[in-house]
């Protein structure tokens, strides 16, 4: 394995509370009750407009407005209660000494990089790629393939770590291996998995994968 590329939400960081709060503010702005938390958590990892479309009968205009309201509130609150999962910082420090590391997330890059830097992880990652940089949404493999290019590695030598079926499908389409963060927010839909991580502390096994 030449490189390990990570999703962010539900994989390295527990962003649940801040994301749910932003959803709550957005649905309040739309004038309708927010769906139950477990249903909101189930869409984390999708493009934001697609998240709202799930709950708004695919109404594009209202979904776009929901995404706008979400982003407006989240811009000032994305770090209120977001924290690394236990064991992540130690695992990243060890893995960075042996592998090229990067982040591939549907979170906007400006927030992803700010969060990475705020926890002192900037020097550990060769690149952090977010959703606003002209690439199609997961599971299209374009973002992952771009990171392979930046890291100067072939996809076959990459392990992608994520917590959703979209992550697994993106890795499959790119030709990369996949490690499923089962402690995160999502689930799998029969996609191939090379490693299953039951808890954040299990990230430490990736160095020997």
Report the location of each language-model feature.
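Short helix-capping segments at alpha-helix termini
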Residues: 28-33, 59-61, 98, 120-124, ...
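Hydrophobic residues in well-ordered beta-strands that form the structural core
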Residues: 14, 103-105, 180
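N-terminal helical cap/lid subdomain that shapes the substrate entry/recognition surface
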Residues: 2-89
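Short, acidic loop-to-helix structural element flanking the phosphoryl-transfer center
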Residues: 76-103, 109-114, 141
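Asp-based, Mg2+/Mn2+-dependent phosphohydrolase catalytic module
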Residues: 1, 109, 113-209
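Short beta->alpha linker loops
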Residues: 43, 47, 83-87, 107, ...
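Conserved G/P- and acidic residue-centered "switch" motifs that form tight phosphate/ATP-binding loops
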Residues: 7, 11, 105, 163
């Amino acid at each position: 394995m030449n490189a390990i590329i990570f999703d962010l939400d539900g994989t390295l960081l527990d962003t649940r509370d801040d994301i749910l709060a932003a959803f709550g503010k957005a649905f309040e702005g739309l004038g309708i009750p927010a769906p139950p938390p477990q249903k909101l958590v189930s869409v984390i990892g999708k493009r934001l407009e697609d998240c709202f479309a799930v709950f708004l009968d695919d109404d594009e205009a209202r979904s776009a407005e929901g995404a706008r309201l979400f982003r407006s509130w989240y811009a000032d609150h994305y770090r209120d209660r977001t924290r690394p999962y236990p064991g992540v910082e130690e695992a990243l420090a060890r893995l960075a000494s042996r592998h090229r590391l990067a982040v591939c997330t549907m979170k906007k890059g400006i927030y992803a990089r700010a969060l990475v830097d705020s926890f002192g992880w900037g020097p550990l990652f060769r690149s952090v790629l977010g959703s606003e940089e002209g690439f199609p949404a997961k599971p299209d493999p374009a973002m992952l393939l771009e990171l392979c290019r930046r890291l100067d590695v072939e996809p076959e030598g990459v392990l992608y770590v994520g917590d959703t079926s979209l992550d697994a499908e993106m890795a499959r389409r790119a030709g990369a291996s996949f490690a499923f963060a089962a402690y995160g927010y999502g689930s799998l839909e029969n996609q191939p998995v090379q490693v299953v991580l039951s808890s954040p502390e299990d990230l430490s096994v990736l160095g020997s994968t």
